[in-house]
A protein has these predicted regions:
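Short, polar/flexible loop-turn hinges at active-site or ligand-entry regions and domain interfaces
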Residues: 67-73, 115-121, 175-179
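Substrate-recognition/cap helix-loop segment adjacent to the acidic, metal-dependent catalytic center
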Residues: 103-127
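Ser/Thr-centric signal marking residues that sit
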Residues: 8-11, 129, 133
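Active-site-proximal helix-loop-helix substrate-binding element of RNase H-like nuclease domains
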Residues: 43-68, 130-187
Length: 254
């Protein structure tokens, strides 16, 4: 079974002009990468005023380096989409995957409509990797990941195991790893996450719903510093956030 994993970087959330799209075609059984590309979209890149509104516009030098090193290509939107469609057809891709696919679907639909091009999402069904990781964690098929998160304080504000690409990347690559937030780099970690889900019993081309992750059993040690009369009193405590009907209640143990 061949699948494609992709990611996009955009100017904003509403008028989501895409300036970076990356994708990987991979065989599920062998894990061999059959094709991969990263395209910088010239309609946005060459519009300096527009590109500078992007949240990650400070990565411009990184993109310049990628293009100089021929790791990314500056192309127009139509060329990028045509190439994705060619690879979907050439490799008989059976499923398209993205992390938080609702957003990436919105991006592809918006840009295809804006530029009046074909839409590669018309050529295979799309599935959400976030749904896969939710299923893996809540069905207790990823206990090693859960233990890693609890050990390293990768816990959400609501006290649940974190379930995002950055935390999964740290699980695979170490705590020093940080998500690059460029399309191909993020696609590489997201394809690794997806293959891990398959290895641990989840089925390709299946729609798993995104759901709340399990609550962490660990209580994180924190410090409360009280300053009075030029003196500091430091209390060390553990806390666990509990949801109550009237809002959040913080449980302190000193």
């Amino acid at each position: 079974v061949n699948i494609i994993v992709f990611d996009t970087e955009t100017i904003g959330l509403e008028k989501c002009f895409c300036y970076d799209i990356g994708y990987i075609v991979v065989n599920v059984e062998s894990k061999n990468v059959l094709a991969k590309n990263e395209f910088i979209i010239e309609q946005v890149w060459n519009n300096k005023q527009l590109f500078e509104t992007a949240y990650y516009c400070d990565k411009k030098e990184l993109y310049v380096s990628k293009m100089r090193g021929r790791k990314a290509k500056l192309v127009n939107w139509g060329y990028a989409i045509t190439q994705v469609i060619k690879d979907i057809k050439n490799f008989n891709v059976e499923g398209i995957y993205a992390y938080n696919s609702n957003f990436d679907t919105k991006v592809i639909d918006f840009n295809a409509e804006w530029y009046k091009t074909r839409n590669f999402l018309d050529y295979a069904p799309i599935f959400d990797i976030w749904g896969y990781t939710s299923e893996l964690i809540t069905s207790e098929l990823a206990n090693d990941y859960v233990e890693f998160c609890e050990k390293n304080a990768l816990i959400s504000e609501s006290g649940n195991i974190q379930n995002n690409a950055d935390s999964w990347g740290k699980f695979f690559n170490g705590l020093e790893w940080n998500e690059e937030h460029t399309a191909l780099s993020d696609t590489e970690i997201e394809s690794k996450i997806l293959l891990y889900c398959f290895e641990n019993g989840l089925t390709p081309q299946t729609e798993y719903k995104v759901k709340k992750c399990i609550e962490s059993n660990s209580k994180q040690e924190k410090e409360l510093i009280i300053k009075h009369n030029d003196k500091e009193i430091v209390y060390k405590y553990t806390s666990k956030r509990e949801y109550k009907k009237n809002g959040w209640k913080i449980e302190l143990k000193i």
